[in-house]
């Protein structure tokens, strides 16, 4: 496999608070990596570094062998990185179809002149974007709500809309920030199947932050655990789940294994 992402000794401070402390790991093409940790461990902060919302104080982040740390956030999608957010960021006054089409514009070439005069190549581009959007709506089971506004849809459906919008940018790396948040057991199971399908059928490498242990362990090829901004474990799902440092981080001393009966990692 070819290495796609290489996180090297990334550190970030907010004043006197250490948010990330020398975090390193890599991700190969075609893998699904689960990033776990108690609340405040630094997971979303690391995601924000990967998507260039934050700039590390130290370390480097390489994507396809090139550093990301000097690239502005609006130039991330064009190199093949897309993400979803814990708090959905859909355009509430645009239809589901339009939300997905907007995602496709992230990797399109356009300028003021072509927009103003509707040049032929731009019309062809718009037609291709709409065709791709309909394909994604079919894949994610959203065709029936294509002309609906997101705000009136159930949470699980809105999460699929945001996922479709991210995929419309044709990413090589997809960052999923707590995709199972607020979903019921059946919806989480369906999400797990969907994540695997996206990896296999769309050939997308996936990095997800998630508190739902059963989901992480069922879909991930590799898991990285953080605590207080440091990496405390890395390995297969089974290895990380039984790691003593991970057990201590989640449950404190005196426990033999992480309890996954509820499907969620207990908060510290």
Question: Could you describe each region identified by the protein language model?
Answer:
Residues 2-268:
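Glycine-rich phosphate-binding loops of nucleotide-dependent enzymes
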């Amino acid at each position: 496999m070819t290495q796609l992402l290489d996180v090297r000794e990334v550190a970030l401070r907010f004043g006197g608070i250490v948010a990330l402390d020398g975090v390193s790991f890599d991700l190969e093409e075609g893998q699904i990596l689960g990033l776990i940790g108690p609340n405040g461990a630094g997971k979303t902060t690391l995601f924000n570094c990967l998507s260039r919302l934050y700039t590390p104080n130290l370390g480097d982040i390489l994507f396809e062998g090139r550093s990301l740390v000097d690239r502005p956030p609006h130039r991330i999608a064009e190199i093949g990185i897309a993400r979803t957010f814990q708090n959905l960021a859909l355009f509430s006054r645009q239809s589901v179809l339009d939300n997905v089409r907007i995602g496709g514009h992230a990797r399109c070439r356009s300028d003021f002149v072509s927009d103003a005069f509707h040049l032929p190549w731009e019309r062809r581009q718009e037609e291709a974007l709409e065709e791709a959007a309909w394909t994604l709506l079919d894949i994610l089971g959203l065709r029936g709500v294509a002309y609906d506004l997101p705000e009136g849809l159930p949470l699980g459906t809105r999460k699929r809309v945001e996922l479709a919008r991210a995929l419309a940018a044709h990413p090589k790396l997809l960052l999923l920030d707590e995709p199972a948040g607020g979903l019921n057991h059946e919806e989480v199971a369906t999400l797990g199947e969907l994540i695997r399908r996206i990896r296999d059928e769309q050939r997308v490498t996936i990095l997800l932050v998630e508190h739902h242990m059963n989901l992480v362990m069922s879909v991930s090829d590799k898991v990285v655990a953080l605590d207080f901004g440091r990496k405390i474990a890395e390995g297969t799902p089974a290895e990380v789940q039984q790691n003593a440092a991970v057990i201590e981080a989640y449950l404190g001393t005196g426990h033999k294994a992480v309890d996954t009966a509820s499907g969620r990692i207990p908060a510290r």
